Amino acid sequence: MASDAVKYMPIHGGGTTATTAADIKSFFSALKPKKTSTFAYAFVITFVSFTLFFAFSPSPNSSSPWFSNIFTSSSTTTTSDNTSGSQFSSIFSYILPNVTSTKPTNRSSDATDSLSVNATSPPLNSNSKNGTLQTPAPETHTPVAKNTTFESPIVNGTNPDAKNNTSSHPLLSDKSSTTGSNNQSRTTADTETVNRNQTTSPAPSKAPVSVDLKTNSSSNSSTASSTPKKQTKTVDLVSSVKQEIEKWSESLKNCEFFDGEWIKDDSYPLYKPGSCNLIDEQFNCITNGRPDKDFQKLKWKPKKCSLPRLNGAILLEMLRGRRLVFVGDSLNRNMWESLVCILKGSVKDETKVYEARGRHHFRGEAEYSFVFQDYNCTVEFFVSPFLVQEWEIVDKKGTKKETLRLDLVGKSSEQYKGADVIVFNTGHWWTHEKTSKGEDYYQEGSNVYHELAVLEAFRKALTTWGRWVEKNVNPAKSLVFFRGYSASHFSGGQWNSGGACDSETEPIKNDTYLTPYPSKMKVLEKVLRGMKTPVTYLNITRLTDYRKDGHPSVYRKQSLSEKEKKSPLLYQDCSHWCLPGVPDSWNEILYAELIVKLNQLSQTQRKT
């Protein structure tokens, strides 16, 4: 339009009124034929110009209220979505402070993480580096399947039976945020609350609140001065967790934890013999008079990596506000006591580590719990040697008879189904005479099998356990582990027939002398592969088979009965393990698994 005006202006400007009037008349005459199109053209240019001006110059003031509101609303909506859609823990708020918490994208095919950010994570790739269990070959000796630490796949990335699947995960959701910075100085009332709730599953927590160290100050002036110290301590602990993960994650992610050897390390054991008064007498070999001590200085060394030394302070920080539960037989009690001693030795004030109430029975099944007060966490053990219920019926003669209900899980299962980390095991009690024979002992419903092979009974029991896990344990909130069979080393008999191991002071060094891989563990592996809920298999069978030197043998107690004094060598324990000892290494593997999973989650967050 400007060019048209210039085009029809008089040369040299003109000067008379008549000329000007004529020019104006001429100008409008020229526009008249194109009046409609010219007006539309001018309107479009004007609208676009104003639109661009407001779009690229947003302002909160009244000069651009419409676009200002659009930008502000968009930002607010994004923040809200992220907050409601991501429930990450304080640990990861600290570890990844600059990562925006959003719903994760699908992981790469080689990820092996049961700590996926939500329940719709992709299924585990069968060829993943550290998460696949290959079918054990029919070998004479214990096979070491590549990457035997595996998680069973989740069909289509989801578990249809899991309840309340959310993006919250164990070790991820901020359970400690409800107590804020006061976790380090819990009141007596808080402690009593912990004690009262040890045998009840924790109520579903609300959406976690991220802990912001910059604003985590008390409004009370009397406590404000102590806040910087608490914050500094928390930052130091979380920084240590981050450093531990960064230090070990790369070497551990492709490592086959269970293929390796025992090597001597003079820096072991992880706690001084006799320093932990929590150890049962039957595991306290040095106190019971065992003279040799080299068995305590051995650590498990995988071929392709080194396991991190278990740092109790860091593990406690990972477990802050959480429950770690062991469920199974006395071998899992062995592992539980080992971990409690390691963690207890890492706290500054051991008076703040205590047993919740001693041995507690729930419907006939024993439960033990230790409270770590400064961390508001518990490490518990539930006695369930078969993982299914021991039963009692009355026969036609009115005589009470013991049976094993293959179709019912242990009675205490309701008490631990909501725990954050659960470590199951079973195996040794299936070798006893009654279970081995299987005559009039195994029961399903009202039917008592006159005869049932022990392997079939074992399969039925584990299938019942697996179905219970899929129905009751939410993989979005709980990590599930299953520890494999722990080898026994009776020579010249069994546990009740004069079997011995008291002369063993060194581990087996030649694989030829290892025992065949237990058939029951092959059954277990098949059940785990068929499960939808991720279960990490701690296949410690082979690594324990080397350790014929690690059992209590005759050093299982100090005061012998008169009968035992006459033939002390006839009463030996070659099933359980001295503490400190082999179970410490099981816990180091568990610790390494947690580091791997936390690192995988952090990588997933970074990608989003």
Swiss-Prot record:
The UniProt annotation puts the region (Disordered) at: 101-236
An annotated Gene Ontology molecular function: O-acetyltransferase activity
Motif GDS motif per UniProt: ranges? 328-330
Q: Provide one Gene Ontology biological process annotation.
A: plant-type cell wall modification
- As annotated in Swiss-Prot or TrEMBL, what is the tissue specificity of this protein? Expressed in leaf vasculature, growing part of the root, expanding inflorescence stems and trichomes.
- What topology does the record note for this protein and the membrane? Single-pass type II membrane protein
Question: Major place of localization?
Answer: membrane
Q: Which residues cross the membrane?
A: 38-58
The UniProt entry, under InterPro entries, shows: TBL, TBL_C, TBL_N
Q: What segments bear the compositional bias annotation Low complexity? A: 215-227
Q: Does the keyword Membrane apply?
A: yes
Query: At which positions is motif DCXHWCLPGXXDXWN motif?
Result: 573-587
The UniProt regions of compositional bias labelled Polar residues, in chain numbering, are: 101-137, 145-203
**Pfam family name, one:** PC-Esterase
**Which Gene Ontology cellular component terms are annotated?**
endosome; Golgi apparatus; membrane; trans-Golgi network
**Keyword list, A-Z:** Membrane, Signal-anchor, Transmembrane, Transmembrane helix
Give the UniProt subcellular location, in the record's own words: Membrane
Give the protein's function.
Answer: Required during cellulose deposition. May act as a bridging protein that binds pectin and other cell wall polysaccharides. Probably involved in maintaining esterification of pectins. May be involved in the specific O-acetylation of cell wall polymers.
One further remark on this entry is:
Contains 2 motifs that are conserved in esterases, but it is unlikely that this protein belongs to the catalytically active pectin esterases. Tbr mutants are lacking leaf and stem trichome birefringence characteristic of plant cells that contain highly ordered cellulose in their secondary walls.
Q: What is this protein called?
A: Protein trichome birefringence
The species is Arabidopsis thaliana (Mouse-ear cress)
